[in-house]
Amino acid sequence: MLASVLIVAAGRGRRFGDPLPKQYLSVAGICSLRRCLDLFLSLGSIGAVQVVIHPEDMPLYSDAVAGLTDMRLLPPVAGGETRSKSVTCGLQALEAHTPDCVLVHDAARPFVSARIIADVLAALETSQAAFAAMPVVDALWRVEDGAALSPVSRDGLWRAQTP
């Protein structure tokens, strides 16, 4: 199975509070987007990588991809007003490549592992959709008007590793 990757990097990161969008922040000397690109482009199971960026971020994007010559990295496309619209823009750009499947990843999550990617691809061999998740282990409480009312059962709850 040859997968395409759609990396969503069009967000503004306003909740984060930094004027620079999270995907362009340096983590141990390498920007988050570049860490994602380096990982996905190191995998032989990836046939194309499409990045969706904010229309005003081309200079930041160019800095992030400086020196990358892998032909699987497609020219970036502009995102939409929301994350879902940005994903749609990216999927439309990938249509011509007719991938077997598309992995959607957020550029602000630089520490995904090759193992997690392999596990998701393996799940896609027998399923139409898959995502990385972890069981909920934290205590959960139902709160109303600032008062804790009752604990919530964690049975059957999983934390998706996506926003």
Regions found by a protein language model. Give the residues of each.
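N-terminal glycine-rich phosphate-binding loop and ensuing alpha1 helix
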Residues: L2-P59
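Short phosphate-binding loop-to-helix
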Residues: A66-C101
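Short, high-confidence coil segments that cap the C-terminus of an alpha-helix
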Residues: I46, P99, T126-A129
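Residue-level signal for inorganic ion chemistry
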Residues: I7, L33, G90, H105-D106, ...
